[in-house]
C-alpha cells in the first residue's frame, strides 16, 4: 500500500512539474539530478533522511542549483519542504515517463531466439513508428524456446509473431479439427 501511495504521490508531483516547466529545456537537468541521486548514495540518503533538517537539504539543493534550471530548484525545494525528499527519484522518473509520452517516444522490449541485427532493429522501429511513435530504446532479450520470430512488448501491448506461438495456434486448431471430425 505504501509503495502504491508513494507512486501515486510521485506521479502527482511529476505532473505538476510537467505542467509548469518547459519540458524540452528541463529534461536534461532532470536527467542530471537522477544521475546524481543514483550514483551518489550519500546525496540520496541525505535528502531522504528525516533526521536531516529541511534547511540543510535546501542548502544542498541550492548548491546543485548552480548547475540546473531555477524552476527545477524551486520545485525540489517545495518537495523537500513537503517532506517528500524520499521520493525525488520516483518523481523524476515519472516526469521523464510523461516527457516520453508527450514526445511520443517509447522503449520496447523484443524477445527473440538470436540477437537482432541493426537492420532488423530499424525494421521493427519503422513498423512501430506510426502506431506508437518514435522508438528511443530497444532491449533485446534472448529466449531460444520461441524457436524463431520475435515477441515485442510496447507499454502494455504484446505483439507475438514467434514460431512457438504459431505452432501452439496450429496445435489448438488441429485439436478442434479432430474433435469436430470425431463428433
UniProtKB/Swiss-Prot annotation:
Chief location bin: membrane
PROSITE patterns: ATPASE_DELTA
Subcellular localization: Cell inner membrane
Function: F(1)F(0) ATP synthase produces ATP from ADP in the presence of a proton or sodium gradient. F-type ATPases consist of two structural domains, F(1) containing the extramembraneous catalytic core and F(0) containing the membrane proton channel, linked together by a central stalk and a peripheral stalk. During catalysis, ATP synthesis in the catalytic domain of F(1) is coupled via a rotary mechanism of the central stalk subunits to proton translocation.
Record-given protein name: ATP synthase subunit delta
InterPro entries: ATP_synth_OSCP/delta_N_sf (IPR026015), ATPase_OSCP/d_CS (IPR020781), ATPase_OSCP/dsu (IPR000711)
Record flagged with keyword Transit peptide: no
Family: Belongs to the ATPase delta chain family.
GO cellular component: plasma membrane; proton-transporting ATP synthase complex
Gene symbol of the encoding locus: atpH
Amino acid at each position: 500500500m505504501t509503495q502504491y501511495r508513494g507512486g501515486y504521490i510521485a506521479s502527482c508531483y511529476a505532473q505538476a512539474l510537467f505542467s509548469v516547466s518547459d519540458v524540452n529545456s528541463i529534461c536534461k537537468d532532470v536527467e542530471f539530478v537522477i544521475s546524481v541521486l543514483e550514483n551518489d548514495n550519500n546525496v540520496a540518503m541525505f535528502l531522504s533522511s528525516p533526521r536531516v533538517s529541511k534547511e540543510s537539504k535546501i542548502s544542498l539543493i541550492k548548491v546543485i542549483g548552480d548547475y540546473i534550471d531555477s524552476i527545477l530548484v524551486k520545485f525540489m525545494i517545495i518537495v523537500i519542504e513537503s517532506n517528500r525528499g524520499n521520493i525525488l527519484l520516483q518523481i523524476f522518473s515519472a516526469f521523464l515517463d510523461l516527457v516520453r509520452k508527450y514526445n511520443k517516444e517509447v522503449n520496447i522490449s523484443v524477445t527473440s531466439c538470436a540477437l537482432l541485427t541493426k537492420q532488423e532493429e530499424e525494421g521493427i522501429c519503422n513498423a512501430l513508428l506510426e502506431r506508437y511513435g518514435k522508438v528511443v530504446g530497444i532491449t533485446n532479450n534472448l529466449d531460444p524456446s520461441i524457436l524463431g520470430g520475435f515477441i515485442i512488448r510496447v507499454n502494455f501491448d504484446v505483439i507475438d509473431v514467434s514460431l512457438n506461438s504459431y505452432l501452439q495456434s496450429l496445435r489448438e486448431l488441429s485439436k478442434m479439427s479432430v474433435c469436430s471430425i470425431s463428433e
